[in-house]
Amino acid sequence: MLWIWNALIVFVTVIGMEVIAALAHKYIMHGWGWGWHLSHHEPRKGAFEVNDLYAVVFAALSILLIYLGSTGMWPLQWIGAGMTAYGLLYFMVHDGLVHQRWPFRYIPRKGYLKRLYMAHRMHHAVRGKEGCVSFGFLYAPPLSKLQATLRERHGARAGAARDAQGGEDEPASGK
């Protein structure tokens, strides 16, 4: 029966991490933490960017929780495991799929993965840290809603950014 609780803790943590990551992205990375995150909104030079330090911080916290959980603080290791699972999903979707940091290239053409892909492209369509949309990594609002928000915030510039990306069906290269 304990394994059910452990699995539930991992699952709830993964869901919770999406909320935490979206809030951290919006209010920390696009706020006082912009110094690290700026590198992610510029063309990458080399395999790594300063923004990758956020992954190191979350990984260190996850490792600490797993360690503390293994020393007797039961739920902490499963919270750490959930954070690790979220980190793996984040790496696969955000770094791999969206930003093509894999050795092969795949661009989704339909469904959920296309929605995530395009939502993050719309996030990067805005120059600077202000006025961006879609701060989540594994959930994205409907694309029509994001496009409307961009148009509302940036007027004709949002349409120009979308057109430069080739519209919904043809994402831009780069970030």
Curated annotation (Swiss-Prot):
GO terms for biological process: carotene metabolic process; xanthophyll biosynthetic process. Pathway: Carotenoid biosynthesis; zeaxanthin biosynthesis. The keyword RNA-binding does not apply. Its EC number is 1.14.15.24. One of its GO terms (molecular function) is beta-carotene 3-hydroxylase activity. It comes from the Bacteria. Keywords: Carotenoid biosynthesis, Oxidoreductase. It is an enzyme of class 1 (oxidoreductase). It catalyses: all-trans-beta-carotene + 4 reduced [2Fe-2S]-[ferredoxin] + 2 O2 + 4 H(+) = all-trans-zeaxanthin + 4 oxidized [2Fe-2S]-[ferredoxin] + 2 H2O. Pfam families: FA_hydroxylase (PF04116). The keyword Acyltransferase does not apply. Residues 11-136 form the Fatty acid hydroxylase domain. InterPro entries: BETA-OHASE-like, Fatty_acid_hydroxylase. Catalyzes the hydroxylation reaction from beta-carotene to zeaxanthin. Belongs to the sterol desaturase family. This is Beta-carotene hydroxylase. The gene is crtZ.
